[in-house]
């Protein structure tokens, strides 16, 4: 009986140790800030999206305006750029070479396409949801409008209004935020409740 009890005790202890190891591994290696989930799942981008450091927009602007860095915009708007390049009879190889080059270098043709895209946008610009992970509080995700791509590839930052930083609990000390471009106008319309001015009042008091 003692032997059976000892064996059962060892079995229970082994199960307990395995459970403890699993919990600690998940906490330290998967769920922590440098963990696997943040590296490979939460930090992985969907198309078309981007993530970059934020800075304040210090030129005259609308409160819901967003200016994107050059290299980030080339990546996020690759499909849009390829669509225009195909109209001008670029081959797939030529498109790949041009977009690879312009990821880190300014190019007049790409800037012309960017300006054309914004000019043809049905709204104020291209609507994007803008979020600072991992915040999920009200107004942490806002619908802003991408109106300009910075022409200096050396500036790797998104710029947006000081009026929009409270909801996403952001500041300009190196914080990064992510932007996702809705795939069609129907989805953009459904996201309109995320506009910054719709979070100006408390949902419980007004």
Short names for language-model regions:
Residues 206:
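Phosphate-backbone binding interfaces of nucleic-acid-interacting proteins
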Residues 1-203:
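Core mixed alpha/beta domains of very large multi-subunit molecular machines
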């Amino acid at each position: 009986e003692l032997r059976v009890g000892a064996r059962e005790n060892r079995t229970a202890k082994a199960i307990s140790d395995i459970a403890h190891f699993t919990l600690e591994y998940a906490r330290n290696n998967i769920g922590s800030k440098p963990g696997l989930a943040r590296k490979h799942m939460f930090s992985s981008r969907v198309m078309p999206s981007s993530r970059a450091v934020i800075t304040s927009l210090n030129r005259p602007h609308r409160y819901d305006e967003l200016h994107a860095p050059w290299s980030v915009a080339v990546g996020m708007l690759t499909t849009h750029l390829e669509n225009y390049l195909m109209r001008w009879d670029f081959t797939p190889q030529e498109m790949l070479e041009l977009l690879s080059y312009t990821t880190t270098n300014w190019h007049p043709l790409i800037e012309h396409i960017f300006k054309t895209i914004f000019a043809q946008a049905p709204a104020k610009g291209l609507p994007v949801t803008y979020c600072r992970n991992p915040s999920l509080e009200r107004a942490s995700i806002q619908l802003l409008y991408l109106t300009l791509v910075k022409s200096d590839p050396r500036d790797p930052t998104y710029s947006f209004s000081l009026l929009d930083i409270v909801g996403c609990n952001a500041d300009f000390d190196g914080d990064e935020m992510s932007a996702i471009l809705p795939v069609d106008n129907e989805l953009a319309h459904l996201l309109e409740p995320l506009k910054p001015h719709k979070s100006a009042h408390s949902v419980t008091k007004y």
